[in-house]
């Protein structure tokens, strides 16, 4: 297939800038770099014309960056964002449809250089990224001198909701979380303060049913949960979720599983009213002899329908001591509804492997993207960009049935990185010869009752191990009956027709 690749170098504020775009129909890989900046990507959205906007902030400060990409991946506009004596973090892009074209609101937590209390800057930009207005909102509800620890945003028809986590200037840890509501002009409508003992961390905000706002986070102590609020920020419900235990065989061993309290955990409410969660999975295995073992190398995509104590369906990776996987940093799950009233769910995770010779720090070895329906039935699961230091930050479901993955590329040890954007087609292809696309295995249904199937690859042999490491069965082909297995958690070691081996986690729950 014919592809196009071009490298263009030009001057921006007397600084050399390089970008590269490889494009073929819908799929592309675009990179952007500036030698004196280290861009940490925070958000991306699809525009009404099928293009994309990307935001990033300079890791070394004090500026931020906005990029506009065409539907083919060409960089049309790059816009630096700076303010005098202030460090700006472009965190979130929100689209605001206007009668005469599209406008966008960019929400930027900001730190004044004089050490005074943090502010929230609201930028309105037009479709060419020209700044239409700039407004600085004092965070008067913060304690004096407080800085931002984190910020999450959500837009509705008439207002913007924010979960703003503050830290005192003498500490690196959060001290309080403020839920705030602004109108689209940036006027503060109301706010509420939550202390860390009742709401420790906010992972994301999302639209819930009945015109409510959902908040997914750590509601303490060591419990992940979902809070819902009405439009006036009054608490409507509070549920602890995503924890369960399972006995392992007949020896008295048991395993406790819960969603990891991580910044990159995400929850969303799907059109059918169910919840989907993307997170790292923390596994704590307790042996009958008193010994215990903890592992958090796995990523889970789980669906909850009736209550929050056991997933209705889930996809769980399993990694041995040589690798670790974790979800995309700022948005690891997204979904879209198609014209046929279908819902398509995408999850993105980073796969890191540990080098040989006892070195501790893992290095990036690919981005894993999974596409499912809203029942988490997998359409495809693939690894991209095995070669190169690519770290996914955001995944966006796109209107054509595919997705866009954006993130940072470069040397994370030295904290020097550039921007990349990878457009994946609806069928899981990119269409570029230089981008390796590897099929990844998945197992379904999960939890299993009678029959389990291996998808994604042609399985030659599958070995099944219990949590104690004992092999309890093996089968050839892509399907097996598991009725003889006791309820519990099992590891599947799958060898495909290419001789490659992958490991997955399966739950048997009859």
Model-derived segments and their meaning:
Residues 44, 54-55, 66, 77, ...:
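Hydrophobic strand positions within the blades of repeat-based beta-sheet folds
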Residues 59-62, 111-116, 167-173, 219-223, ...:
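Short glycine/acidic-enriched loop and turn motifs that connect beta-strands
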Residues 391-431:
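Blade-level signature of beta-propeller repeat domains, shared across WD40, Kelch, NHL, RCC1
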Residues 46-49, 95-101, 154-158, 207-210, ...:
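Residue-level detector of Asp-centered blade-edge/turn motifs that repeat once per structural unit
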Residues 487-510:
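C-terminal tail/sorting-segment detector
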Residues 25-39, 75-89, 134-146, 188-200, ...:
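Short loop/turn motifs that cap or connect beta-strands within the blades
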Residues 424-444, 470-471, 509:
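Residue-level detector of functionally pivotal "anchor" positions at catalytic/ligand-binding pockets or at interdomain
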Residues 59, 433-463, 476-484:
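Glycine-centered coil/turn sites that cap beta-strands in beta-rich domains
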């Amino acid at each position: 297939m014919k592809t196009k690749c071009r490298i263009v170098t030009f001057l921006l504020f007397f600084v050399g800038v390089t970008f590269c775009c490889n494009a073929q129909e819908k799929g592309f890989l675009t990179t952007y770099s500036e030698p004196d900046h280290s861009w940490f990507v925070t958000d991306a959205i699809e525009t009404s014309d099928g293009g994309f906007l990307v935001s990033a902030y300079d890791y070394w400060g004090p500026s931020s960056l906005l990029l506009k990409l065409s539907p083919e991946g060409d960089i049309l506009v790059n816009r630096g964002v700076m303010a005098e004596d202030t460090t700006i973090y472009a965190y979130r892009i929100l689209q605001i449809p206007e009668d005469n074209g599209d406008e966008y609101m960019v929400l930027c937590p900001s730190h004044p250089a004089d050490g005074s209390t943090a502010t929230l800057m609201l930028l309105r930009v037009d479709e060419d990224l020209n700044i239409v207005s700039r407004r600085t909102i004092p965070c008067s509800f913060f304690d004096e001198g407080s800085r931002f620890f984190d910020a999450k945003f959500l837009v509705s028809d008439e207002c913007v909701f924010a979960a703003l986590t503050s830290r005192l200037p003498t500490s690196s840890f959060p001290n309080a979380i403020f839920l705030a509501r602004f109108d689209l002009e940036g006027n503060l409508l109301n706010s509420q303060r939550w202390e860390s003992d009742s709401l420790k961390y906010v992972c994301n905000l999302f639209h819930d049913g009945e015109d409510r706002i959902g908040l997914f986070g750590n509601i303490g102590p060591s419990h992940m949960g979902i809070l819902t609020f009405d439009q006036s920020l009054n608490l409507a419900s509070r549920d602890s979720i995503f924890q369960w235990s399972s006995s392992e065989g007949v020896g008295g061993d048991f395993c406790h599983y819960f969603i990891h309290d991580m910044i990159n955990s995400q929850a969303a409410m799907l059109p059918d009213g169910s919840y989907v969660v993307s997170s790292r999975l923390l596994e704590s295995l307790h042996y009958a002899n008193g010994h215990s073992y903890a592992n958090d190398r796995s990523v889970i995509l789980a669906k909850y329908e009736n209550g929050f104590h056991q997933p209705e369906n889930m996809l769980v990776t399993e990694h041995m001591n040589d690798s670790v996987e974790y979800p995309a940093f700022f948005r690891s799950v997204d979904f879209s509804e198609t014209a046929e009233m279908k819902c398509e769910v995408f999850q993105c995770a980073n796969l890191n492997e540990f080098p040989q010779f006892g070195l501790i720090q893992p290095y990036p070895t690919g981005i894993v993207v999974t596409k499912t329906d809203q029942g988490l039935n997998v359409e495809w699961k693939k690894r991209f960009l095995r070669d190169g230091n690519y770290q996914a930050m955001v995944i966006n479901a796109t209107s054509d049935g595919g997705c866009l993955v954006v993130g940072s590329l470069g040397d994370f040890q030295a904290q020097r990185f550039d921007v990349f954007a990878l457009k994946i087609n609806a069928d899981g292809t990119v269409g570029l010869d230089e981008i390796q696309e590897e099929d990844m295995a998945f197992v379904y249904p999960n939890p299993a009752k009678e029959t389990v199937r291996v998808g994604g690859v042609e399985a030659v042999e599958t070995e099944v191990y219990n949590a104690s490491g004992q092999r309890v069965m093996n089968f050839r082909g892509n399907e097996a009956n598991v009725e003889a297995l006791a309820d519990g958690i099992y590891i599947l070691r799958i060898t495909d027709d290419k001789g490659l081996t992958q490991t997955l986690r399966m739950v048997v729950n009859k």
